[in-house]
Amino acid sequence: YERKHIGILEQVRRYVHLPVIVKLGMNLTNPVALINQLYANGAAAVVMFNRPYRPDIQIENVHFHAGEMWTRPSDICDALRWVGICSARIPNLGYAVSGGVHDGWAVVKSLLAGASAVEVCTTLFWNGPHRIEVMKEQMMQWMEEHGYDNIPKEWKTFLSGKQNDDVVFIKNLMQIATLLIKAAHQKFKK
């Protein structure tokens, strides 16, 4: 499955002479390895993550129908995690966060994680195009409160693991959570 990304990128680059950005799905076995291969094969940036169609089942009429299509602010967490990890390992690639970007603070979080762009959709449907201005004002407010006049280059590596141990902390936390889940599973199996 993941090798198909490389083949598609190679085909697109054969016919297009513009920077190619690859939008990735969330269900990857090794995002760092895949993104490294995409970078090696000429990707200019990656977007994390595509939100696939999510069907639901209508139990009264017993048929498939559209599931929840809107993102929630909490949907940003996986993208923040992986942008932070990947931008530390493959720093010369561009990163964009997609999913859960509903306000200016989510933009700040994305930039601090290592992204250079965000994709915004749900909040524009809900609030209209003027939401972009509100998000910009929120971001500017945060920057002013923290002594920034502009977006410095250091933001790209601020929380990406180069200047602190947050990425190691997150990895360790995920390993502990996995061990706890396995232990709970074993306990209930008995």
Language model segments and positions:
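Glycine/Thr-rich beta-alpha phosphate-binding loop at enzyme active sites
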Residues: Y1-R3, L34-N92, N127
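Generic structural signal for well-ordered alpha-helices
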Residues: H5-E10, V32-N36, L80-G84, V107, ...
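Catalytic cores of alpha/beta
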Residues: L28-N41, G84-Y95, V101-V118
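Glycine-rich phosphate-binding active-site loops on the catalytic face of alpha/beta enzymes
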Residues: A45-P55, G100-V101, A106-V134
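C-terminal helical cap(s) of enzyme catalytic domains, especially alpha/beta-barrels
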Residues: P55-R72, L111, L124-Y148
